[in-house]
Design a protein with these regions (language model features):
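Extended, low-polarity segments enriched in aliphatic/aromatic residues
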Residues: 2-53, 58-239
């Protein structure tokens, strides 16, 4: 696999997201999923729907999310839909909670630590994906961005428990009693991300926004305020 060419701009605007996407030279085909973080209730740092409107309109995408595996405002479809409305996502976009009905299994025959991934069943409805990530810290992964979006983010509630425990359980109630060492968790994220990336067979693009960067993830209801200056926007393809 060739090294990915990564584009960078210091400009962090609605327009710069479109410009850097177009620099990639790809047109995402068919039904386009836009994977982003809807933001936990109480979190102040997630990317706002107004900020990403131009790029989502540009790719004619559907915002996709999956339910969480821990207590909060996003661990059931009913609560997650209310959160999406309160954060304004469905004011501007079609929004699909991909595991609202069920999940499906993706095999990872060459996985390093896990051999399968449980993802929202609606993933099969999409031909392409734009992974639109907010770069920030993460308590288990070190930082949360594209890798976390593809792995934890696309995983169903059961899949999130499976990745966090490196395959020990799909039961969210048993998740916190079965946490692995950090390196194994990161390897499990990489395995899960790889199978989702490969599913789209090149019809996938990545944009990472480095603004409002906190040590805490957007999944934290009580997050630290940003602790460093904004940096810019990254975009890349991995074929």
């Amino acid at each position: 696999m060739e090294k990915a060419k990564v584009y960078f701009t210091k400009e962090i605007t609605e327009e710069s997201l479109v410009k850097i996407y177009e620099k990639l030279g790809i047109e995402l085909k068919g039904n386009v999923a836009v994977k982003l973080h809807s933001g936990e209730e109480g979190n102040q740092n997630y990317l706002r729907p107004e900020f990403v409107k131009n790029i989502i309109d540009r790719v004619e995408g559907t915002v996709v999310e999956c339910n969480t595996a821990y207590d909060g405002a996003r661990n059931t479809t009913e609560k997650h839909k209310k959160l999406i409305t309160s954060h304004g996502w469905d004011k501007y976009y079609k929004v699909d909670i991909m595991d609202s009905e069920k999940d499906i299994t993706l095999d990872i025959p060459n996985g390093l630590v896990i051999k399968k991934d449980y993802v929202g069943s609606h993933l099969d409805n999409y031909d392409s994906m734009l992974v639109l990530s907010h770069f920030k810290g993460h308590p288990m992964g070190g930082y949360g961005s594209a890798l976390k979006q593809l792995s934890i983010g696309v995983a169903s509630s059961r899949g999130k428990a499976y990745i966090h425990t490196v395959g020990k359980t799909t039961d969210a109630n048993k998740l916190w009693d079965n946490l692995p060492e950090q390196d194994k968790f990161i390897e499990a994220m990489a395995d899960a991300a790889s199978v989702v990336h490969n599913k789209f067979k090149g019809n996938i693009a990545y944009i990472n926004v480095m603004k409002n960067m906190s040590v805490d993830c957007d999944c934290c209801a009580k997050a630290e305020d940003p602790c460093m200056q904004d940096i810019g926007v990254l975009a890349s393809l991995i074929q």
